[in-house]
Amino acid sequence: MESRKIKVMATAIALIMVAMVVDAAGADKGKDKEECTAQLVGMATCLPYVQGKAKSPTPDCCSGLKQVINSDMKCLCMIIQERNDPDLGLQVNVSLALALPSVCHATADITKCPALLHLDPNSPDAQVFYQLAKGLNETVSASAPTGSASEPTSMSSTPGSSAGNNSGRTTSVPGTNHAQSFSKQWLGLEVVAHFFVIFYIFILV
């Protein structure tokens, strides 16, 4: 009984993650959904941790994270890019999310995300990744034991030209046109509909 409830809730979380990927993909919705759905379902159990609701990630979360990093890092980049989209109603603690690879003993370089997402290195979207990585490195360095050499971190940073004062802080970039905004609003309605379906199944179970 309890196992079935957990599976239902994990499926609901996975639906949100998949929706995030589909929205970020734009014209390549079908292709990106096909590539990322399985990996994101595997990471569904990470959501309680990166939202600050769990003290540590589950073994399944770490396994799913490593699979995404090894098979398609682009999917992880999309999750980071869309982490604060208000239309999706999904809030992620950036510090916990970026520290997740280290906690799971995995290696992930988010400074590669702009290239994987085909972003201009000097664009605001790209600068978000560079500054988040820089902020993580500074946090790790500050927490290193005194008198001992700090271990190399899995995140590296590239200096940006337009976001030098936003290190480690959450940054959101507004949409470029009305069509993109309408698309996100429609996607939000779809996610809500999915939740009602999952909630109904959850009650029946």
UniProtKB/Swiss-Prot annotation:
Source organism superkingdom: Eukaryota
Cross-referenced SMART domains: AAI (SM00499)
Protein's GO biological process: lipid transport
Subcellular location: Cell membrane
Signal peptide: 1-24
Disulfide bridge map: C36-C77, C46-C61, C62-C104, C75-C113
InterPro entries, alphabetized: Bifun_inhib/LTP/seed_sf, Bifunc_inhib/LTP/seed_store, LTSS, Plant_nsLTP
Lipid modification (GPI-anchor amidated asparagine), residues: N177
Record's GO cellular component terms: cytosol; plasma membrane; side of membrane
Entry membrane topology: Lipid-anchor; GPI-anchor
Gene3D superfamilies: Plant lipid-transfer and hydrophobic proteins
Region named Disordered: 141-176
Lipoprotein as UniProt keyword: yes
Tissue note: Expressed preferentially in expanding leaves and sepals, restricted to the distal side. Expressed at low levels in roots and stems.
Gene Ontology molecular-function annotations: lipid binding
Glycosylation sites: N93, N137, N165
Induction: By abscisic acid (ABA).
Family the entry assigns: Belongs to the plant LTP family.
Entry-linked PANTHER family: BIFUNCTIONAL INHIBITOR/LIPID-TRANSFER PROTEIN/SEED STORAGE 2S ALBUMIN SUPERFAMILY PROTEIN-RELATED (PTHR33044)
Protein name as annotated: Non-specific lipid transfer protein GPI-anchored 13
Gene that produces this protein: LTPG13
